[in-house]
Regions:
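Acidic/glycine-rich beta-solenoid
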Residues: 2-50, 55-370
Length: 370
C-alpha cells in the first residue's frame, strides 16, 4: 500500500486500512486480464479485499505501461469515507497524479458533501494541498428528496484562492409535487438570469409550467416539458401525446416567441423543429413507425422516417430490419441512424440464444460469442 500509508490516519467513525489484504477471497474476483487485440500484452487488474470482503484496493496496468491504483477507506458502517486514486504515466514525459476524495454523510447515511485534493507532477510544485476543495454539496427535504445541489467552488481572481465561505460554481434547486414527482429544476432561472444557474427544466403533469400551457393529464403521464440553457438563453418545449395504452405517440417541439405565463407564445417560426411524430406500435408493444425532424442548414426537414420490421413475419420481438424513408437520410452525414442495408435482406441476425450476430446497418457481418 506504500503510497497510502501517509494517509492512513483514523478520522471519526473510520477504520484504518489493514496492512495486508485478506486471504479469505473465495468467490471474490481477485484478478482479471484483458487481451488487447493486435498486441501481445494484456491489461491486468488486481483486487484486494479486507476481512469483511470489502474492496480496499484495485491496482491495474494502464495503456502507458504504468499503473492505476484506487484505495478506499471505509467508515465503521461500511460506507466509503476516503478514496485515493494514484495514476502513474510511464514512458516519455512520465507523470504521477494523486486524487484524494472525501465523502461526508449525515446521520441517515446520505452523502452531504464531496471534497477533493489533487496533486500532479507538473502542477503546483507537485505538493498535495493542505485543505480540501468542495466539489459538490447537497441538501435534502423532510421527505428525503434532493432539494438543492451545489457544484464546484469559485476562486477569488485577486489572489487565486477559493472564497471563504464557499461560493459554488453552479446551483441546482429541485421541487416536487405531493406525490414526489419531479416538477422542476432551477425554476427561478426559467424567467430570470442567475449567475450560478445554467439550466432550467419544468415538467407538466396535471398543471402547467410557468411559461406554457399543457393539456393536463391525470394519469401520471408527463404532458409536456419546458427547458432553458445558458448558451442562447432560449426557452423550448415539448408537448407530448399518448395513445390509450399510455404509449408515447408524438412530441411537438416549439420555441418561445413572446408573452408570459399561460399567454406565452411558442412556435417554430425560427425554422427550428425537433418534433417527433407517427409513433405506432404492434400488438406486443414493439415500435413500428417513427418520424423525426432535425436542424439542417437553417431548416428543419424530416431526417428520420423509420419503419421497424420484426422476425418471423412480425410474430416476434426480435428486430429484423429498420428502413429509413426520409429524403434527408440518404446523405448519411447527419450523425444519427444510417440505413446501411437498403433492400429486402434483414439488417439484424441472431443466434439461438438471442444474441446479435450481425448488424448490416453498421457494416458488421458477423459477431461470435464464447
Amino acid at each position: 500500500y506504500g503510497f497510502f500509508i501517509f494517509y492512513n490516519a483514523s478520522p471519526d467513525y473510520a477504520q484504518q486500512i489493514p496492512a495486508n489484504g485478506s486471504n479469505q477471497t473465495r468467490g471474490l474476483v481477485t484478478w482479471t486480464e484483458t487481451k488487447i487485440l493486435g498486441q501481445a500484452a494484456y491489461q491486468y487488474s488486481v483486487n484486494i479485499y479486507d476481512d469483511k470482503a470489502r474492496l480496499i484496493q484495485v491496482k491495474s496496468k494502464n495503456q502507458t505501461g504504468g499503473a492505476d491504483l484506487i484505495t478506499t477507506q471505509y467508515s465503521w458502517s461500511g460506507q466509503p469515507l476516503v478514496m485515493l486514486q494514484k495514476q502513474i504515466k510511464s514512458g516519455a514525459n512520465a507523470q504521477t497524479s494523486f486524487t484524494v476524495t472525501k465523502f461526508i454523510y449525515d446521520d441517515l447515511g446520505r452523502v452531504l458533501r464531496t471534497d477533493k485534493k489533487i496533486q500532479h507532477t507538473n502542477v503546483g510544485g507537485n505538493v498535495l494541498p493542505s485543505v480540501y476543495t468542495t466539489v459538490s454539496q447537497v441538501e435534502y427535504d423532510a421527505l428525503g428528496q434532493l432539494k438543492q445541489k451545489t457544484v464546484g467552488s469559485k476562486k477569488n481572481p485577486a489572489n487565486n484562492t477559493y472564497y471563504s465561505p464557499r461560493q459554488p460554481l453552479q446551483e441546482q434547486a429541485y421541487e416536487y409535487n405531493i406525490r414526489g414527482w419531479l416538477l422542476n429544476v432551477n425554476k427561478g432561472y426559467m424567467n430570470n438570469a442567475n449567475t450560478n444557474q445554467y439550466f432550467a427544466m419544468e415538467l407538466g403533469y396535471d398543471k402547467n409550467a410557468s411559461l406554457s400551457t399543457f393539456a393536463p393529464l391525470y394519469n401520471g403521464n408527463i404532458a409536456g416539458m419546458l427547458w432553458k440553457s445558458e448558451g442562447d438563453q432560449q426557452r423550448r418545449k415539448y408537448n407530448f401525446s399518448y395513445d390509450a395504452a399510455n404509449r408515447l405517440t408524438a412530441g411537438a417541439f416549439a420555441q418561445y416567441v413572446s408573452g408570459s405565463g399561460s399567454s406565452a407564445v411558442f412556435n417554430i417560426s425560427a425554422n427550428i423543429d425537433y418534433s417527433v411524430s407517427g409513433l405506432t406500435y404492434d400488438a406486443n408493444g414493439n415500435l413500428k413507425t417513427m418520424t423525426q425532424k432535425g436542424l439542417i442548414l437553417n431548416a428543419s426537414p424530416t431526417i428520420d422516417q423509420f419503419t421497424y420490421n420484426y422476425k418471423n413475419t412480425e410474430y416476434s420481438n426480435k428486430l429484423a430490419k429498420v428502413t429509413d424513408s426520409a429524403a434527408a437520410a440518404s446523405s448519411g452525414k447527419l450523425g444519427d441512424f444510417k440505413d446501411g442495408n437498403v433492400g429486402a435482406t434483414d439488417d439484424y441476425s441472431y443466434d439461438v440464444n438471442g444474441n446479435l450476430t450481425a448488424d448490416l446497418n453498421k457494416g458488421i457481418s458477423a459477431i461470435s460469442y464464447n
